[in-house]
């Protein structure tokens, strides 16, 4: 999933701004999308796994995220191992925004 795919996703667009973002891997690992956002390389956005999740509002106002190009791939950092978010879909419930890997 890249930045444009996330921002153009109808579920994501309609989600409340204070909801945290959760990533669910294909092997059912549930990972909080960390509040540390880095875009050190052109075309890639990294979310570090930390104890505090990032909300939709925090993500949309994050300087690194704003500056990243629309085609930047989103990667989740699992304690040093960077996992690409390839084929994903987004669901929203009352408590969070779920990015779910196929």
Protein language model features and the residues they cover:
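Short, intrinsically disordered N-terminal pre-domain segments
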Residues: 1-5
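Detector for the mature cores of small, proteolytically processed
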Residues: 12-102
């Amino acid at each position: 999933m890249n930045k444009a795919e996330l921002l153009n996703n109808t579920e994501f667009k309609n989600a409340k701004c204070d909801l945290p973002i959760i990533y669910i891997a294909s092997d059912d690992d549930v990972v909080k999308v960390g509040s540390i956002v880095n875009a050190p390389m052109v075309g890639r956005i990294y979310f570090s796994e930390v104890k505090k999740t990032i909300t939709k509002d925090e993500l949309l106002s994050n300087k690194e995220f704003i500056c990243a190009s629309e085609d930047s791939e989103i990667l989740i950092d699992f304690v040093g191992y960077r996992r690409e978010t390839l084929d994903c879909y987004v669901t929203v419930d009352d408590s969070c925004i779920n990015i779910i890997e196929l």
